Amino acid sequence: MDGTDALEKLTKGLSGGGGSLHQTKLLMEFQLRGLPVPALLNSSTTEQFLNTVAQLPTDLSKFIRDYRVFALVRAAYFLEPPSSIDPLEAARALGRLVDILSSQPPQNTAPAQPPTSDDTLNNCTLLKLLAHYADQIAGFKTPALPPVPPGIIGLFTCVEQMYHACFQKYWAAALPPMWILTYDPPTSPLQDWLIVAYGNKEGLLLPSGIPSEEVLAKTLVTEHHELFVSRSNSTETAVTMPVSKERALAIYRVFAKGEVVAENTPILAFTDVELSTLKPHYLFIYDFIIEALCKSYTYSCTQARLESFLSRGIDFMTDLGQYLDTATSGKQQLTHSQIKEIKYRLLSCGLSASACDVFRTVIMTLPYRPTPNLANLSTFMGMVHQLTMFGHYFYRCLGSYSPTGLAFTELQKILTRASAEQTERNPWRHPGISDIPLRWKISRALAFFVPPAPINTLQRVYAALPSQLMRAIFEISVKTTWGGAVPANLARDIDTGPNTQHISSTPPPTLKDVETYCQGLRVGDTEYDEDIVRSPLFADAFTKSHLLPILREVLENRLQKNRALFQIRWLIIFAAEAATGLIPARRPLARAYFHIMDILEERHSQDALYNLLDCIQELFTHIRQAVPDAQCPHAFLQSLFVFQFRPFVLKHQQGVTLFLDGLQTSLPPVISLANLGDKLCRLEFEYDSEGDFVRVPVAPPEQPPHVHLSHFKKTIQTIEQATREATVAMTTIAKPIYPAYIRLLQRLEYLNRLNHHILRIPFPQDALSELQETYLAAFARLTKLAADAANTCSYSLTKYFGVLFQHQLVPTAIVKKLLHFDEAKDTTEAFLQSLAQPVVQGQRQGAAGGSGVLTQKELELLNKINPQFTDAQANIPPSIKRSYSNKYDVPEVSVDWETYSRSAFEAPDDELRFVPLTLAGLRKLFVE
């Protein structure tokens, strides 16, 4: 029931007729499902409900009348999800509810307080505890631990939600008191930037003396151009290199003091200096370096520096893995301080919750192509994968952890998912990642988060409940919340008989009397002979005459659903307080009924069907005491299995179909680009150095296009960029079906548990098995297509045309030095280094076969990729050649007229002496 009018609707349902069976059904659902707290905050509505319940003749209504606080508040809940609950607002709502219940007078038909062995369920006691706890929550502030709910109110759903919400705030505020003790200026300002940006994002304290983001951004942008790869020198984008692009964008945003256009920003890179000086204990803030290495970008760093970086990273991750293993291995519970210490350790090296998600995305979108020749990269990435997976599930558990049943249920789901993701049946094994080097089971390592069940408190409440039906309802609630953490013998060693004994003045009934009475009972009867139903002979006789026959009809699936549920309810309710001999059988029957309702109402309760099998097994154990050869039919349980699993199968079939359709849709662009890249690698181009353009061979060859070299290079880069983006888009399509497949693995594991249940019911599994095969085939297809795309010519087209993207053989700087060469100061070293460059990278290996010209269709595609490609002469810049005369450019002469008083040259009056030369004289001169 949801909404603020839920209590009003329940009151109308109770007073609208339908008989005591219908009224008991409504009250049972009310006690199990609860009502929203806002629905209880109307004083008149609450009073009307209590007055209505006081007039009902059922046993459950008597309990609610006498123990109104426990009955109304125990299952009351806040509508908001746990992460959205404001503890202060919740405390105020709880305080108003306490005031309303305190103002309700005792009902006229009820005693002031029924006699009990203790005050566990006492209305006044519970109201005081609730009021006190509401005050404690209102005063709660981090970093203090949340106040512990006193007494039994810690079992109340709304109190659990408040306690849980406080713990979420407590864990979110748990940050290390000091991240970096002292500031040691690094060689490269990039490390300072990464530390400051990460610390500010995560709210970590930074050491004094470290520069601000503004200073560091200015230094990086203005003084370290080597750390940025401009768009003109890279085909990578925010799609193909999201982390590197985002890191550079953050720097430029701070530098520009505002928003900048993401497309215009470069990509953040690194040099040997960064690789050799970055500290490994901050490893995971270097996410852009790890992304680049995964995608074969080394930015001309030396092999030695790259391998040293990987080696130091592996050493650090080995130490971190050993610490985590030691801290969690074999630990059933950790203290809050120990849990915070693990969080601090992860945060200190850059493994925040958001960082774990970033790395998981990077790993999921790795290119399916050989990585650089780095010996340790596969091991390095295996450790990154394992530690980020651990961090991901650690933070998920931390965000859901509190000592409550609410947390227990959620944590079980998280750990089950972690176990499924880490299973060997998971097909995702990237070729660039080695087998997991840190061999521990994450679901076991994080099991310390699972809170222990408050067994003593649960047993105390169970013993204090005076109603057998309410005990059954409470046990159902406990089993639903705590599952296997609660022992099966919760009711043992407790007097399950009524609080008051029935005194009869007639002789005890005989077996024949009991059997005759049972034969006369009809489903739906509510009146009963108390002398008969209290007889020790009644349980066996009722089991033979009604319990087993009705169950057999239900389990053989011979009854219509509503009729079957009605008959089960009657078995649970008939003489519930008097027929004490039926209590052991009714307890599992009541749990079974509500598990069936969970399945039919699609509440998706965890393990509902498996728990139902447990209940049926326990029920037939009791039945066989009266009917030893009683067998459990399977048809109804199999139909429930199909009902529960069919929507899951259909939804996931639709998901994988959409994935395959999306994959099919994404293929044409990749194929088109791959074919075009392959064709370009087969062609022989002519280069005209005079006009700096490329002549492209086409069919027909009469007028081949002349493409300026700059436009040709731009087209090559665009093709490579488009191919990489299309490949990433193709792999990104699998993002939603990967978690879907994890859910499928969980269902398969659940099916395996069902098939190995002691009842040995053969549940149909063909649909799930076929669905798994479909997913595996889809993953295999994606892997092959992505690998093929990454190995096409177009994926690395700039590498094939690498000679066009080399630096100039004689750069402009060298030309300037040549023009201003000074023999007294300059050397020829720079010229020699420039001339030592190879003219070409090596012998080009063209693909064999294929056409030697571009078709018109391919030419149109090139023009679509870059409209300037075939714009012929219009795209060729005008020639810079000029017409020269036989005159020299004479620089302007600056004359100091104070020193030089004349404006004309006057030759000295010296006598010129000439020596006549003859041919004989010249010969004589050379001979000598």
Curated annotation (Swiss-Prot):
Q: Name one GO cellular component term.
A: viral tegument
Q: Which domain of life is it from?
A: Viruses
Q: Which InterPro entries match?
A: Herpes_U30, HSV_ITP
Q: Where is this region: Interaction with large tegument protein?
A: 482-928
Q: Which UniProt keywords apply?
A: Host cytoplasm, Host Golgi apparatus, Host nucleus, Virion, Virion tegument
The subcellular localization recorded is:
Virion tegument; Host cytoplasm; Host nucleus; Host Golgi apparatus, Host trans-Golgi network
Query: Could you provide one GO biological process annotation from this protein's UniProt record?
Result: virion assembly
According to its UniProt entry, what is the function of this protein?
Plays an essential role in cytoplasmic secondary envelopment during viral egress. Interacts with the capsid via the large tegument protein/LTP and participates in its transport to the host trans-Golgi network (TGN) where secondary envelopment occurs. Modulates tegumentation and capsid accumulation at the viral assembly complex.
Q: Which family does it belong to?
A: Belongs to the herpesviridae inner tegument protein family.
Quaternary structure and partners: Interacts (via C-terminus) with the large tegument protein/LTP (via N-terminus).
Question: What is the name of this protein?
Answer: Inner tegument protein
What organism is listed for this UniProt entry? Human herpesvirus 8 type P (isolate GK18)
The taxonomy runs: Viruses, Duplodnaviria, Heunggongvirae, Peploviricota, Herviviricetes
